[in-house]
């Protein structure tokens, strides 16, 4: 590191010293350490930042584990639900911009009190709203907080991770959103059938956030401004960083943070942020809508759609693989000291396996574990690109000004949420078969009164009865008229001359002839299943809409996956905006030169103070 690679701190000189405040204020709002922590403590602080990220995203994604239940419970259309997601993302986008102020104010308070606010909104707010508009308001408020935390948590991870361990650390941070989705799926799978309604999922996640708030209030720490706003490439830089921090002047503080957006709002950072946002369209589709996708497109061997629990089980496999792969590829990227090769291979592999994943929708009977294998490999390729990208992006920001990492992450958060929000505007245009499927699914899955089966199973198990009833609907409608039922029943029990005459008078000669003609079919296909067939007839319009929606849904989802594939393709050119090396050998040479520069500069500082 040369003498001009580190930049001074961002804490405002007008900011009062913590010593001027009482002990209660310091306990609640002052969470700084003034010496770079040892490896053990640093790992603990990183762990808390990751834990907070996991819990915050668990609460944010709670709705995705019970989306079909929410649509049914609030009588909400799929389009309305998507617009809630859009508004929440757009609010989060603009909330991320002022979150860049964490460069001056620190990260810890945003995270700690963000946990408290989100916990209360989720645990108390959602269970106590009774309509779709109330739900929309609460989720939008959660999006506001999430947008700020999207900036604060990776900034804190950067503060406690030198560049040589950055991809590993960012791999752990990106586990946060992924693990949040994983926990959502696992908890829903294990608990949803134990509780009366979907609100239980929000209560569980909200209480978890409040408990995590209490832990972070006691133990989460920020680096002091003078430490966090310098560039640290390796753990061996610690002595140099601390020596500089003690010698930073107020004028250097002001110069380092003058006009932050003018320093950060550059085409390479914007392009890189836009590229990864497009690449992650499939990630956000998975996080927000895979529960609906799996439960409306795929069916079991008996013809019934995958249940919400089965869909969450598939989600758990996807997110679990994603989480493990993020850590593995982050560590590998640090060991090889390169980012761009991982990003390029991950994007190409992601395109190939998203094509394969999309193709599975063509067969509604695709086996459950076949889907598991394909989605695990897809998740691995997404992680292969994303963890190194996060590390590379923070390093790009540090090259411009290490004192403005929070501002750089605010730019990324703004572009990410804005891109996702705008793209989702078109989701209901591409996918519009969800409403008839979700709205009418209960009619197909609930038990038919007086029987031990449901419409979906009956349609699958008794196609001959359904076909006969459909082809002779007008004839059977005459037989089922209330005034004709006793006559038909008497004729079936005793085909005497008197009963035949009564039937001829009630039904007419044409219908009586049909009774005689189809007496075998009536006895074997209709009479034993009269309750089931009457149920199908009474709900024919809704069940027909459901069947049409099921037929249309796979193609519509495949169209959206093509949009996601296009986003991945557009990401590839932005890989070249990253300033890192392609060759591990050249990267090792850069590190050797950096180590020599650090030793020389530290010697100069020590000599100057001697």
Language model segments and positions:
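Cytoplasmic membrane-interface "Motif A"-like loop-to-helix N-cap segments
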Residues: 104-115, 334-348
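Juxtamembrane intracellular "pre-TM" segments in multi-pass secondary transporters
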Residues: 19-39, 224-273
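Cytoplasmic helix-loop-helix junction between adjacent transmembrane helices
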Residues: 138-176
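Helix-loop-helix hairpin linking two adjacent transmembrane segments in secondary transporters
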Residues: 173-225
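C-terminal ends and interior cores of transmembrane alpha-helices
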Residues: 116-130, 348-365
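Extracytoplasmic gate region of multi-pass secondary transporters
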Residues: 63-65, 265-319, 386, 390, ...
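A late C-terminal transmembrane helix in Major Facilitator Superfamily
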Residues: 402-435
């Amino acid at each position: 590191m040369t003498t001009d690679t580190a930049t001074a701190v961002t804490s405002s000189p007008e900011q009062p010293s913590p010593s001027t405040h009482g002990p209660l204020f310091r306990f609640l709002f002052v969470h700084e350490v003034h010496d770079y922590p040892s490896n053990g403590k640093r790992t603990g602080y990183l762990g808390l930042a990751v834990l907070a990220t996991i819990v915050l995203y668990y609460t944010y994604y709670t709705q995705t584990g019970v989306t079909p239940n929410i649509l049914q419970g609030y009588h909400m259309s799929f389009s309305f639900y998507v617009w809630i997601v859009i508004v929440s993302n757009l609010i989060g986008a603009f909330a991320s911009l002022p979150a860049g102020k964490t460069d001056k104010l620190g990260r810890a308070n945003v995270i700690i009190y963000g946990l408290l606010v989100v916990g209360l909104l989720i645990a108390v707010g959602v269970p106590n709203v009774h309509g779709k508009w109330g739900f929309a308001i609460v989720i939008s408020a959660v999006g506001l907080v999430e947008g700020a935390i999207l900036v604060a948590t990776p900034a804190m991870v950067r503060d406690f991770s030198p560049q040589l361990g950055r991809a590993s650390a960012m791999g752990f941070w990106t586990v946060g959103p992924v693990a949040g989705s994983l926990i959502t799926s696992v908890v829903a799978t294990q608990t949803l059938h134990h509780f009366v309604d979907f609100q239980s999922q929000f209560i569980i996640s909200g209480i978890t956030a409040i408990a995590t708030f209490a832990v972070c209030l006691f133990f989460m720490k920020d680096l002091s401004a003078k430490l966090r706003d310098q560039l640290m490439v390796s753990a061996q830089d610690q002595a140099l960083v601390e020596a500089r921090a003690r010698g930073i002047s107020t004028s250097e503080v002001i110069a380092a943070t003058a006009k932050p957006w003018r320093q950060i709002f550059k085409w390479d950072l914007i392009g890189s942020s836009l590229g990864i946002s497009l690449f992650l369209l499939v990630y956000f589709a998975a996080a927000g809508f895979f529960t609906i996708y799996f439960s409306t497109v795929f069916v079991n061997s008996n013809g019934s759609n995958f249940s919400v629990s089965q869909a969450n089980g598939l989600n758990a496999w996807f997110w679990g693989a994603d989480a493990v792969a993020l850590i593995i590829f982050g560590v590998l990227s640090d060991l090889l000291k390169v980012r761009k090769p991982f990003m390029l291979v991950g994007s190409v592999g992601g395109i190939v396996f998203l094509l394969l994943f999309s193709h599975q929708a063509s067969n509604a009977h695709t086996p459950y574990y076949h889907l598991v294998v394909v989605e695990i490999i897809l998740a691995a390729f997404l992680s292969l690109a994303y963890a190194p990208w996060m590390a590379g992006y923070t390093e790009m920001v540090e090259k411009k000004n290490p004192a403005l990492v929070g501002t750089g992450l605010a730019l990324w958060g703004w572009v990410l949420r804005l891109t996702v929000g705008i793209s989702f505007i078109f989701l209901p245009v591409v996918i519009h078969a969800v409403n008839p499927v979700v709205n009418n699914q209960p009619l197909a899955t609930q038990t038919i009164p007086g029987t031990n089966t449901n419409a979906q199973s009956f349609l699958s198990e008794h196609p001959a009865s359904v076909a006969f009833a459909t082809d002779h609907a007008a004839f059977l409608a005459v037989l089922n008229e209330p005034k004709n039922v006793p006559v038909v029943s008497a004729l079936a029990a005793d085909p005497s001359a008197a009963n035949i005459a009564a039937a001829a008078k009630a039904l007419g000669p044409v219908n009586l002839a049909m009774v005689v003609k189809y007496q075998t079919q009536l006895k074997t296909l209709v009479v034993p299943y009269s309750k089931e067939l009457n149920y199908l007839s009474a709900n024919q319009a809704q069940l027909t809409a459901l069947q049409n929606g099921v037929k249309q849904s796979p193609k519509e989802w495949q169209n959206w996956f093509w949009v996601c594939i296009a986003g991945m393709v557009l990401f590839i050119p932005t890989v070249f905006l990253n300033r890192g090396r392609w060759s591990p050998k050249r990267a090792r040479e850069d590190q050797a030169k950096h180590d020599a520069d650090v030793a020389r500069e530290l010697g100069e500082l020590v000599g100057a103070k001697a």
